[in-house]
Each structure stands twice: as C-alpha cells, then as structure tokens.
Amino acid sequence: MRKFFGTDGIRGKVGAGKMTPELALKLGWAAGRVLSRTGTKKVIIGKDTRISGYLFESAMEAGLSAAGLNVMLMGPMPTPAVAYLTRTFRAEAGVVISASHNPYYDNGIKFFSTDGSKLDDEVELEIERELEKPLECVESHLLGKVSRIEDAAGRYIEYCKGNFPAEHTLNGLKIVVDCAHGATYHIAPSVFRELGAEVITIGDKPDGININHEVGATSMGKIRETVIAEKADLGIALDGDGDRIMMVNRHGKVIDGDEILYILACDAQDRGVLKGGVVGTLMSNLGLDLALKARDIPFARSKVGDRYVMELLKEKDWRIGGENSGHILNLDHGTTGDGIVAGILVLAAMCRKQATLEELTEGIKMLPQVLVNVRFEGTHNPLEADSVLSAQAEVEAKLGERGRVLLRKSGTEPLIRVMVEGDVASDVKAHANYIAEAIKALV
C-alpha cells in the first residue's frame, strides 16, 4: 500500500501533509539509499519556477548527498528536460521538483529512472520502505558532491530543435507561445524562434508566485485573445513544468490533446511510419475514437494518467498516446510527455502538408464534453454511494450510445472528477452538474 507516492510522485500544499522540508530531506536520503546500490551514484535535480523550489531543491540535495550520491543541479528546467538529461548524463535518476499545473502554493517531487522513464512501482515502494527507517548519514569521505550543469538550457534547446525535420523551416509563421510563467520561459521561445518563426511570448516572466496564474495550458483565455489580436497563425500553451501542451488556431479555437493526437497519428500514417494505433484515456473524447476509426487507426483507452498511457503503449508496442489535457507521448521522440516537442511535431505536420492547424483538424469532430471537479476530502468513497450510482445510471440511460459518463478520483488532488459527454452541449452540462450535486450532498 502506497503511503507517499501518488500517480505522479509526491504532491501537496507546501508546509502541510507530505510536502515539508523534513520529508524532502528524508526522501532524498531514502531514494539515495535505494539508488546507490547500483549504477553511477549520480542524480540530476531540476525544478519549475515556484518559490518553494529553492527549499525543496536544497533539502533533496542534502538528503541525496547524505546517502552518498553526487548531485547535479539544473535550476528551473522543464520536466521532459530532466528526463532527457538524465539519459544523456547516464545518471542513476532524475528528480523533478514541480506541481505541474497546480498553483504556486503546491509543490511536488517525482523521479525518472536512468532511461528517462518514470520509476517503476517496485522502486517507489522500496523508497517508501526506506523512509520508515531512521536517517543515517554515510561516513564523511563517502558523502556526495554537488555541482551545477551550466549549459542545461542550451543542451535541451538543441534536443528540441532536433525533432524538427531539417528540410523545413518555420519562416513566415507567427506563433504565440505561452510559458505559464513556468519552467519553459527561457526555453520554448528560443526553440521556435531559432526554427524560423516570429514568436510572441506571454507567461514568460516568472516571479515564484505567478506560475500557472491565468496563463498556460490550464487557462487558455489570454493566449486566445493574443492570437486573435496579433493575427498570429497559431498559439502554443504549455503548463508550469512543460510536460503538457494545448494549442490555439488562428481563429482562437482551442486545440486540445485529443486533437493533437489525431494530427500526429494522421501524419505518421500518411508517412507510413505509424506503428500500431493510438492510446488515449478514459477521458479521451469519443470524437477522437470515431475520427481514428474512420482512418482505420486502432484506438485503446488506459486509465487516466500519463503513467498508464505509457504502460499501455509498451504493452501494445505502439508509439503515440496521450491525454486530452495535453500530455502527449511519442516514443519515437522521447520517453515522457513533452509539450515543446509535441508542438514541434504538429508544426512539422503543418509544413509537410502545407496546411493550417484548422485544416489538420477537419477530420475530427469533438463531442461536447463537460468536466466538473468536486472537492471532496472525506474518508469514505462517494463513488460507491447509492445516491451517486443512481444519478449516474439515470444520466447514462438518457445519453444512450451517443454519450459517456466517467466518475473518478483525482490522483493528485482531493477532487472527484465528473465527466459527461454527449451530442447536445446544454444537456451534457446539465447532466454533469446533476451528478456533481449528488456528490456534493455527501460532503
């Protein structure tokens, strides 16, 4: 039974629950104990731009050093950059200090293995077992050393650009890039600018507090307005740690993760390089399923979370998968979700077909989908309550085969997520609120 690790590492409000300096120190030590048994005894640490990153970086650094591991600091860098540099430095592990799309007062810690993928469940459980033991520092001559990777940003920028076909250029394209005041603020604009685009940046002035605040992939209003006002060809919105992407076409319409998956799958199929099909999640829009089916592209759903998308991709030996929230995996171009690289792959498809973003999405019709988050911090499971089950069954009967209902607990926040999908937007919204009220009545 997991006590500390959730579906995406450890995450919570800073100074409360799990996210304390004491736990970070002990976690660094416990992870160091497990990781030092094999390999290079070298660990990379990256973080996003939230103010508490300094605190947790220092605590993790001290804990790892106390266990005898050498630490290499990257400073503010996107999560996928940590995965990439963990591989290229042959480090034993990479550590990301980030709460992704959450507000600044939250933070989290997650690990990558030496190949840039997320740690196996068994390794996380082994770390949890070490956490229960008293901290014992190694002898002084065995303590780890700490250094800084001075050219981390430049290395990752070149890696990102390497995913764009050399025979094409972004010359003539005007792109709005929203960095969410997060870890991509000094990376993403340079990548697209160096590939030839005219880049207008927003969300590129982090102050430790403003990460994800009214900007980024979870708040699309500002980028939509900017794309229209600047008469840009498209917009690319990243989240606080750069592992997810949402896009905006020139008319200000949001292009979400499902539509991005459709673009990438069609492009790969047209080039004859699509291996198998596409993995989505239980939250993926039914429209994606139908659009892929029309092109004879297999589609499978995993549980929600990029960890589970990756598991199903490996099980089926497919390459492309992701979530409608914008986590996009393409295993021919990396080992984890990468917002910048996903954007580059969409732009490459546009260049190959000499098509606009809206033209690339003409073949997919998204069904109205409403997601309602209900805060629930009780100890019992509201999804098993008779009143909630009854409300769900009632809605499902009304939707028939042209809709879906999905209720699930968030893996990272004290929320119950209510998703309803169907043909008529107003009905879908009413159905979602009806079920949400049944859950709220239990609080």
UniProtKB/Swiss-Prot annotation:
Keyword terms, alphabetized: Isomerase, Magnesium, Metal-binding, Phosphoprotein
EC supergroup of this enzyme: isomerase
Protein residues bound to Mg(2+): S100, D239, D241, D243
Cofactor entry: Mg(2+)
Gene Ontology CC terms, in alphabetical order: cytosol
Top-level division of the source organism's lineage: Bacteria
GO molecular function list: magnesium ion binding; phosphoglucosamine mutase activity; phosphomannomutase activity
Active-site residues, as the UniProt record annotates them: S100 (phosphoserine intermediate)
Free-text comment on the cofactor: Binds 1 Mg(2+) ion per subunit.
Catalytic activity as recorded in UniProt: alpha-D-glucosamine 1-phosphate = D-glucosamine 6-phosphate
Gene3D superfamilies the record matches: Alpha-D-Glucose-1,6-Bisphosphate, subunit A, domain 3 (3.40.120.10), Alpha-D-phosphohexomutase, C-terminal domain (3.30.310.50)
PTM field: Activated by phosphorylation.
Xref: PANTHER family: PHOSPHOGLUCOMUTASE (ALPHA-D-GLUCOSE-1,6-BISPHOSPHATE-DEPENDENT), PHOSPHOHEXOSE MUTASE
Protein name: Phosphoglucosamine mutase
Gene symbol of the encoding locus: glmM
